[in-house]
């Protein structure tokens, strides 16, 4: 149900901004723009089966015209997550680590407000432990995971070099034995552009 609501919200927002098509960027035009190296932090808060946690990420890649970015990243949960209980009463705790390829496209801009599409696919492992009801470890191992994340992100320019960022989306995890690791994610943070900050100081 939560997944359906998130996907429906994304579709509704895309339909809404279509009415302001004069503010929508053509993705093919951005390839003609100046290229640059991009890098940063890609943390997102998420919910994994009764457990609120954070997936931490670092990325680097190439950007076009400050609108379109292709990224390579590493992502993981340094702490064990999830509260899965099987038919034998064993608790399964999980620790994720995966590499990813993704894109971000700032397709809509109206004055200081912007909307960005987010799509990322990865491959990695879930390092898990199984504990009995007494907390004793009875099994451990790792499973292949293929997470795919998609969502919409929003930004508001507080200053030319300082912006508020937020967003939401859904993470699908394959294969079937890892589907319980799927869930929504939300992002909230601040963006600081050092280059624009230095340009502002130089102009002063």
Residue map of PLM features:
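Gram-negative (and chloroplast) outer-membrane scaffold detector with strong preference
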Residues: 66-135, 146, 156-158
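Outer-membrane beta-barrel proteins
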Residues: 23-27, 47, 64-66, 103-109, ...
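Residues on the lipid-exposed face of transmembrane beta-strands in outer-membrane beta-barrel proteins
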Residues: 41-43, 58-64, 101-105, 119-123, ...
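Residues that define the transmembrane beta-barrel architecture of outer-membrane proteins
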Residues: 35-37, 52-56, 93-99, 113, ...
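Predominantly the C-terminal beta-signal and adjacent terminal strand-loop region
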Residues: 153-204
């Amino acid at each position: 149900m939560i997944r359906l609501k998130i996907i429906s919200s994304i579709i509704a927002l895309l339909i809404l901004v279509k009415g302001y098509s004069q503010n929508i960027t053509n993705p093919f035009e951005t390839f003609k723009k100046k290229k640059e190296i991009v890098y940063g932090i890609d943390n997102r808060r998420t919910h994994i089966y009764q457990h609120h946690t954070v997936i931490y990420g670092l990325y680097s890649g190439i950007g076009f015209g400050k609108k379109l970015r292709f990224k390579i990243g590493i992502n993981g949960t340094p702490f064990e997550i999830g509260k899965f209980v099987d038919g034998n009463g064993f608790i399964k705790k999980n620790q994720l680590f995966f590499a990813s390829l993704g894109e971000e496209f700032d397709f809509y801009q109206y004055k200081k407000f912007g909307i960005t599409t987010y799509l990322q696919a990865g491959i990695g492992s879930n390092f898990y432990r199984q504990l009995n009801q007494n907390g004793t470890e009875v099994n451990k191992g790792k499973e292949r995971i293929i997470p795919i994340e998609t969502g919409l992100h929003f930004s508001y320019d507080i200053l030319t070099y300082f912006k508020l960022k937020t967003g939401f989306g859904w993470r699908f995890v394959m294969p079937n034995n890892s589907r319980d690791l799927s869930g929504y994610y939300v992002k909230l943070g601040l963006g600081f552009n050092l280059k624009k900050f230095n340009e502002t100081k130089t102009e002063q």
